[in-house]
Swiss-Prot record:
This is Uncharacterized protein C6C3.09. It comes from Schizosaccharomyces pombe (strain 972 / ATCC 24843). Transmembrane segments: none annotated. InterPro entries: RNase_P_Rpp40. PANTHER family: RIBONUCLEASE P PROTEIN SUBUNIT P40. GO terms for cellular component: cytosol; multimeric ribonuclease P complex; nucleolar ribonuclease P complex; nucleus; ribonuclease MRP complex.
Amino acid sequence: MNCAFTKELKDEIYQKNYTEHEILQNAYNGKLDILLPVEDASEEAIRSITKIVQDLSFYEFSGSPALLLHPDLYSTFIHTGIATIVSSSDNDNKICISQGILSVTLDKDSYLVSGIDAKPSSSEPKDTLWVANIDLKSAFLRPQWKGFERLKAALGRLPGKWSFYLTFPTEKVDQSYQNNLSHSLPVPMISREINLKKGKLDQAKIPPPLVSTLNRNELFPSNGPLEVLEILSFLRCNAKCVQNSFVPDPYISRYKPSCAVTDVLYLSIKGLFSSSTCLELYELIRNISWNFIGVESFNSFRDVDNSSQLHSGDSSLLSFYDSRTERIRWTWRLS
């Protein structure tokens, strides 16, 4: 678990804070949880968030990975960088596309069969995966050009059964292009609904506000790390960092949190969201008196970073902000 806190500054619109940086590291997100106080600013933010989510398109299709370079899908959605795509297969291989970058993670046999130019993710020979990152926005990758057709053939040689999930902002693509893709793709494109639930939690227990002097010698609030863990529990992550599988209660033994009781607005969204969409939603709530946003990866899917180290397993980003605490924002990364 990584944890950091930053001070929200007036000029922060010009400079990314830690939370924004971490959101941008999660290119493929499947679940967002937002908690807000009951006030007018929260209601307005929820209306804006609902509109943004309703304007997202979310599709599923199954077939060979070569479908990703189908001319209509490639030229309008992938080459322009507006589409976010993640794969699901019956093996350990993974394919994803974000902002026009194709990332492929393959086991050794699939790497050898495909002929894709990839690098090992580790110096350890056992269970090493092979990783490739290809810029599909390149001027040298065009339909019917040699490099394009070579990559398409390599993707077509990948074994297994594949499904792909595609999302993009509807306002960036004319409806005629969406209809054309649905008819021209040789496999069915199934429209998936983004699940959005919102409501009010009556008399919810709220941890005490984070209090910190932000001096060099005190990196925790006045009540110490126990209060931090209590906030983690409230944010529904079940205190993964300390809880053993045989312990049903996420609270630390004999620790009684000093919680207040109040009503809370909640918003829970399930689907597929790019990092830019998550950042857009975060900007709508960041200045409300207190707020929480939780982001979970899509089907335990994480990107491969620039150092070619493979990330796997669940990834969660939790961020809590309270204006009463010297504008401190706590951000947790759970992996």
